Amino acid sequence: MSEPASISTGIAARYATAMFELAEEAKALPALEKDVDALDAALSESADLRDLIHSPIYGRDEASAAIGGVADAMKLQDMTGNTLRLMASKRRLFVLPALLSELRERIADHKGEVTAEVTSAKALTKTQLDKLTKSLKAQVGKTVTVKETVDENIIGGLIVKIGSKMIDTSVRSKLNALQNTMKEVG
């Protein structure tokens, strides 16, 4: 992991810990989850918001006022709006995507949920998704949400990622392994 990424991750983790603990104490985790979803959607949809959090041309006061206006317009919780203003005043808005990811993980963990990123060569049927979800739930002991991606380059099979664990049963990886074995022999 590169140095700037690890610094960003550390900063995001500290903010996420503070926000999560405050929301948990106030029994406001569902509201925090709504704020996370809303901010995530806003970041995906608004180039101006992405520019605001990444561009160094905005001063502390400008960024704080702008992000405060965004928080007010989105009707975010006071805690979320205040955190965003604090991040702007400390020039830390660039960690917002990592903060949202960290908060999403903490909320899911608190609810006993985990997200599995599943890559397949073609879209899985409803039956296949149900079987996979049941199998993964039995393995991890938590409720599993499947985030499906289609990548024809894997030829067949699946790549399943849950947290830091990955199971790669794709035909592409098996062909690559066979190719490496053949290189070693010849």
UniProtKB/Swiss-Prot annotation:
GO molecular function, a single term: proton-transporting ATP synthase activity, rotational mechanism
Main location, first listed in the record: membrane
Alphabetized UniProt keyword annotations: ATP synthesis, Cell inner membrane, Cell membrane, CF(1), Hydrogen ion transport, Ion transport, Membrane, Transport
Subcellular location: Cell inner membrane
Topology with respect to the bilayer: Peripheral membrane protein
Database matches in InterPro entries: ATP_synth_OSCP/delta_N_sf, ATPase_OSCP/d_CS, ATPase_OSCP/dsu
Segments passing through the bilayer: none
Cellular-component GO terms for this entry: plasma membrane; proton-transporting ATP synthase complex
Xref: PROSITE patterns: ATPASE_DELTA
Assembly notes: F-type ATPases have 2 components, F(1) - the catalytic core - and F(0) - the membrane proton channel. F(1) has five subunits: alpha(3), beta(3), gamma(1), delta(1), epsilon(1). CF(0) has four main subunits: a(1), b(1), b'(1) and c(10-14). The alpha and beta chains form an alternating ring which encloses part of the gamma chain. F(1) is attached to F(0) by a central stalk formed by the gamma and epsilon chains, while a peripheral stalk is formed by the delta, b and b' chains.
Reported function: F(1)F(0) ATP synthase produces ATP from ADP in the presence of a proton or sodium gradient. F-type ATPases consist of two structural domains, F(1) containing the extramembraneous catalytic core and F(0) containing the membrane proton channel, linked together by a central stalk and a peripheral stalk. During catalysis, ATP synthesis in the catalytic domain of F(1) is coupled via a rotary mechanism of the central stalk subunits to proton translocation.
Family designation: Belongs to the ATPase delta chain family.
Record protein name field: ATP synthase subunit delta
Organism for this UniProt entry: Jannaschia sp. (strain CCS1)
